[in-house]
């Protein structure tokens, strides 16, 4: 129906009604049947039954079960960190799935939406998403949950959302989930907010799928998710850059002036030394702490609390490791960036798994990778597996169309179309 009377609300309604809320994952419902297990046991007598039962497919690829057995043996030997460097075609997602099911408690973090979709679609793992992905029931599905009434009204308004959650239950309240501290969170009614419903199911699932940005935020600040037996980090070669980005702090004068009616002095921006910046950060933090968050929107209150926490952490890091931080200032503001994350990786991410499994096709040097993340070499077990595809079957073919820089892309992009068509025709 393309009638002009159908507005934005209808778009959201169609989107959310078509979007299934992931159910709580059941490991028991995703084990292989007895006949398949018996067949695979006969074919792979050296592989433990637990591995075969939890493998997601009836036919393993060459070497997959042996890799899982190797990782499982390493965990039993007490290794805290497992680095699986496996080439394209190894089937790393099936390996991760089997181990997650075996240990019964795991997070799987991925970088790309494509890989998230693969895990969610192929293995039925619940993918937990942010508020912006769900339409607000209280707003008649005409806004997303990040802009719903519960996030845009101040605490002092005493707004009550019948679809949301609360720590203080009503008489007939249904338990939604327990947070990482053991605190209980309850639904307010029998009709559940889509955002909270999917999040509760993800918390209650033994295996949960997240992207890195959401996972780092949730685990460190929101605290609804606790530590699990396994933390499986896919595309792990990106972790150092991802942690650096999440630790980066930006302070812009236009934002400071709007929030706290203050700006960083021109003198500090131009010639500020470390001690000047530490004093500046302390003063800015105090000003944010003076904001009465009861009278501002919950979205802004969340941002203020987050800013205070990040500034305190930054001040502490600058005092402890001043040489590890780059201070990049201009006349509009300042950016603080860490040079290395080796002292922060464990506390900001790795501690949320009793055992951490890093997976990538491109680790290159596991010793340098371990050093960059501050891993104890005695706790690291490295497995390297070449791609099962021969070099002849994975050639690199250059077919250049031109430069793709911002000022050239308009000319170059059309030239790529026949090249892409040729590739698609060859492999259809």
Describe the function of each predicted region.
Residues 70-74, 93-105:
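Walker A/P-loop NTP-binding motif
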Residues 1-15:
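Single conserved hydrophobic/aromatic residue that forms the stacking wall/gate
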Residues 106, 427-428:
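Conserved strand-helix element at the start of the C-terminal RecA-like helicase core
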Residues 186-205, 219-222, 298-403, 407-412, ...:
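A contiguous, basic/glycine-rich beta-loop/short-helix subdomain that forms a polymer-engagement track
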Residues 27-30, 37-52, 88, 105-206, ...:
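A substrate-engagement module of RecA-like helicase motors
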Residues 101-102, 117-122, 190-207, 211-295, ...:
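Signature of the SF2 helicase/ATPase Hel1-core->accessory helical subdomain module
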Residues 37-83:
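Conserved pre-motif I regulatory segment
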Residues 77-96:
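Walker A/P-loop
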């Amino acid at each position: 129906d393309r009638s002009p009377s159908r507005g934005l609300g209808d778009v959201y309604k169609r989107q959310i009604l078509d979007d299934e809320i992931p159910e709580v994952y059941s490991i028991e419902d995703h084990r292989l049947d007895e006949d398949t297990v018996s067949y695979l046991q006969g074919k792979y007598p050296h592989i433990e039954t637990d591995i075969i039962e939890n493998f997601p497919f009836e036919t393993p690829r060459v070497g997959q079960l042996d890799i899982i057995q190797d990782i499982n043996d390493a965990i039993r030997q007490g290794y805290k960190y497992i680095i699986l460097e496996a080439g394209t075609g190894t089937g790393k997602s099936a390996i991760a799935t089997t181990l997650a099911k075996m240990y019964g408690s795991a997070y799987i973090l991925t970088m790309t939406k494509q890989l998230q979709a693969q895990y969610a679609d192929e293995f039925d793992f619940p993918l937990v998403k942010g508020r912006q992905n769900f339409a607000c029931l209280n707003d008649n599905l005409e806004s997303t949950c990040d802009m719903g009434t519960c996030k845009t009204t101040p605490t002092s308004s005493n707004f009550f959302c019948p679809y949301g959650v609360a720590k203080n239950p009503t008489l007939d309240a249904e338990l939604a989930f327990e947070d990482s501290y053991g605190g209980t969170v309850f639904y307010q009614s029998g009709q559940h907010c889509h955002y909270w419903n999917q999040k509760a199911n993800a918390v209650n699932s033994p295996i949960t799928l997240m992207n890195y940005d959401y996972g780092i935020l949730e685990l460190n600040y929101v605290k609804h998710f606790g530590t699990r037996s396994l933390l499986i980090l896919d595309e792990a070669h990106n972790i150092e850059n991802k942690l650096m980005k999440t630790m980066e702090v930006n302070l812009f004068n236009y934002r400071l002036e709007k929030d706290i009616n203050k700006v960083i002095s021109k003198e500090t921006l131009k010639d500020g030394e470390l001690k000047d910046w530490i004093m500046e950060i302390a003063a800015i933090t105090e000003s944010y702490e003076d904001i009465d968050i009861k009278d501002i929107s919950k979205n802004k209150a969340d941002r203020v609390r987050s800013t205070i926490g990040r500034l305190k952490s930054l001040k502490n890091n600058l005092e402890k490791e001043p040489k590890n931080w780059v201070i990049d200032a201009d006349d509009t503001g300042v950016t603080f960036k860490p040079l290395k994350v080796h002292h922060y990786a464990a506390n900001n991410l790795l501690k949320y798994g009793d055992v951490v499994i890093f997976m990538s096709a491109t680790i290159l040097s596991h010793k340098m990778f371990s050093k960059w993340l501050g891993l104890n070499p005695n706790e690291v077990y490295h497995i390297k597996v070449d791609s099962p595809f021969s070099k002849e079957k994975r050639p690199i073919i250059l077919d250049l169309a031109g430069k793709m820089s911002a000022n050239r892309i308009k000319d170059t992009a059309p030239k790529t179309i026949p090249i892409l068509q040729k590739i698609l025709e060859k492999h259809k």
